Regions:
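Canonical leucine-rich repeat
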Residues: 53-56, 75, 95, 116, ...
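Conserved hydrophobic beta-strand positions in leucine-rich repeat
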Residues: 41-43, 65-67, 85-87, 104-108, ...
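Residue-level detector of functionally pivotal "anchor" positions at catalytic/ligand-binding pockets or at interdomain
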Residues: 10, 268, 272-299
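C-terminal tail/sorting-segment detector
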Residues: 307-324
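Consensus "Asn ladder" position of solenoid repeat domains
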Residues: 48, 70, 80, 90, ...
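N-terminal capping/linker segments that flank leucine-rich repeat
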Residues: 1-64, 101, 122, 143, ...
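Leucine-rich repeat
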Residues: 58-61, 78-83, 100-103, 119-124, ...
């Protein structure tokens, strides 16, 4: 038992020292008076060299916990009921937060998670899990989610069906598309650089203010519906030529060529109000097709009378419309 009579055991001296620094405890003796912690609702003990949070169960009223930047390998919060949790910057591989039904903010960046289960956290509004080892992420139950930052993982699939987020950051993954992105009509900030996107159609997101899609394999980019777009980064997409916009004059005046330190677009990119198939560079047909994608970046079969993206065995990509 962690709670022994009138005292709660705190075996980690760094944890207890953090409590002393906060005026919650008064002596480094391995225990804290249970009456001193039972009513505490907020505990910020970040960057304290803590290796073990045994004793946290004695904080019966705790709703806000920041234990980031410590040396935790495990974190047992099964008897707490949090609305805010930041456990970023530890060595965690597993965490059970299924009992935190009122959790609104969850930050677990810079850990070693390969999977996370947030299905029970249906009230979640803000979710950060970047710089982990996630190979999958299910947010289908988090219908109130407004901000998701899952960059720098190993995700090859991301479905945001039924959500309406304001912010989505998914850079540095292995994504070729984001399923049901169009559901998120309130999206204002999208950052998806350093992935494998072939196409990015954003007509369903007129409120976008920021789009960063650098270092992909984009062949098509349509930002013609984003009248309020102030920030655009498309460099590092060698197969992208024409960027569809509503006002070419404004686009040319707003965004400049990337020079290695600053800028927005590659030198061969240009803006047009009507990027057509004829604007695409033609390739020789002797190359072997390795895969075919639709305009949403999803792999598909050959379909006549439908514009598709053809990836060849030499790595080049071609947009073609094959007529009957």
């Amino acid at each position: 038992m962690l709670v022994a009579g009138q005292f709660t055991l705190i075996p980690d001296s760094a944890f207890e020292q953090a409590l002393i620094n906060l005026g919650i405890d008064n002596a480094l003796d391995g225990v804290v008076a249970s009456s001193s912690i039972s009513a505490i609702d907020t505990l910020i003990i970040s960057n304290s060299n803590i290796e073990n949070l045994e004793g946290i169960s004695g904080f019966h009223s705790l709703t806000y916990l920041d234990c980031s930047v410590n040396n935790l390998d495990t974190l047992d919060l099964t008897v707490n009921y949090l609305t805010f949790l930041d456990c970023s910057g530890n060595n965690l591989e597993y965490i059970d937060i299924s009992n935190h039904l009122a959790l609104l903010t969850f930050k677990c960046n810079y850990n070693e998670f390969s999977q996370l289960d947030v299905n029970a956290n249906t009230s979640l509004l803000y979710f950060e899990c970047y710089e982990n080892q996630l190979v999958s992420l299910d947010v289908s139950s988090n219908i109130f989610l407004t901000e998701l930052r899952c960059n720098a993982n190993q995700l090859s699939y991301l479905d945001v069906e039924g959500l309406d987020m304001y912010v989505l950051v998914c850079d540095n993954n292995q994504l070729t598309t984001i399923d049901n992105l169009s559901d998120n009509v309130s999206l204002k900030f999208l950052s998806c650089s350093n992935n494998n996107f072939y196409s990015l159609l954003l007509s369903a997101h007129p409120q976008l203010n920021w789009v960063s899609c650098s270092n992909n394999q984009l062949f098509q980019l349509d930002i013609s519906s984003q009248a309020g777009l102030n920030y655009l980064f498309t460099w590092g997409n060698p197969s992208l030529n024409c960027i569809n916009v509503s006002d070419v004059v404004v686009a040319n005046a707003t965004w400049s060529v990337w020079d290695g330190q600053s800028g927005n677009i590659d030198g061969h990119h240009y803006f047009s109000a009507n990027c057509s198939i004829s604007s695409v560079n033609e390739f020789k047909d002797c190359k072997k097709i390795s895969s075919v994608f639709n305009m949403y970046g999803q792999e598909t079969q050959l379909i006549k009378n439908t514009p598709l993206l053809y990836r060849y065995d030499d790595g080049t990509i071609q947009k073609k419309l094959i007529l009957k």
